[in-house]
Design a protein with these regions (language model features):
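Short, polar/flexible loop-turn hinges at active-site or ligand-entry regions and domain interfaces
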Residues: 17-18, 71, 99-103
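Conserved kinase catalytic-core helix
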Residues: 14-44, 48
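Regulatory N- and C-terminal appendages and interdomain linkers associated
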Residues: 98-197
Length: 197
């Protein structure tokens, strides 16, 4: 994948005392898993070793490169989602600890790295909720549509379609449903503005 990096190469260059850099890497991982799950893909071996990273604006975009254990379904059950998240948490923790040991970092750092791996699940759940929420608001609060779209764009998602539907028992209340595209909003926007690929 042109312009991408393996996580080990990135990790070896990141200052160990600045977790914000690792957080960007792990946010990309959470975004990738959300994308796969939205499309009915159970990864089965979500790990940093099976992932490449590229830049998308200020975000790191993650790409699946090892799909031997993946399965494609029309949609995933809560059990499948939870199982894939558990696999990811364990594999990411191991994937962070291994290069830390190679760099000779103190063993006390393992706890921090494990906590960072566990935080990927929180990021995943936040993204999942943002994509699947169907907020209800008053007819006069239509500005919230723009706020919802802007929030999804900030998370890196292009919004393909917005549907407003009255809540059945109160026509002054609207439910917003948003259909989002892939998580490449920033890269697409740069291409539109510059004409560069």
């Amino acid at each position: 994948l042109e312009g991408s990096w393996q996580y080990r190469r990135l990790f070896m260059r990141l200052p160990p005392d600045q977790p914000k850099h690792r957080a960007r890497l792990l946010d990309g991982m959470a975004g990738l898993l959300v994308e796969l799950h939205r499309h009915g893909v159970f990864w089965g071996d979500c790990s940093l070793a099976n992932t490449l990273f590229s830049r998308d604006g200020q975000l790191l975009q993650a790409w699946l490169v090892g799909a031997e254990t993946s399965e494609i379904h029309p949609s995933l059950s809560r059990g499948q989602l939870g199982h894939d998240l558990a696999i990811m948490t364990e594999n990411v923790a191991e994937g962070l600890i291994d290069p830390a040991e190679r760099l000779g970092l103190p063993e006390e750092m393992h706890e921090t790295l494990i906590a960072e791996a566990e935080h990927v699940q929180i990021t995943y759940e936040t993204l999942w909720q943002a994509l699947h929420a169907e907020p209800v608001f008053g007819f006069t609060d239509r500005y919230r549509v723009e706020g919802t779209v802007r929030r999804l764009n900030e998370l890196g998602f292009a919004v393909d379609e917005v549907t407003l539907a009255p809540v059945s028992d109160d026509p002054d209340q609207l439910r917003i449903r948003v259909a989002v595209g892939d998580r490449r909003y920033h890269a697409q926007r740069v291409q539109e503005l510059t004409g560069l690929n």
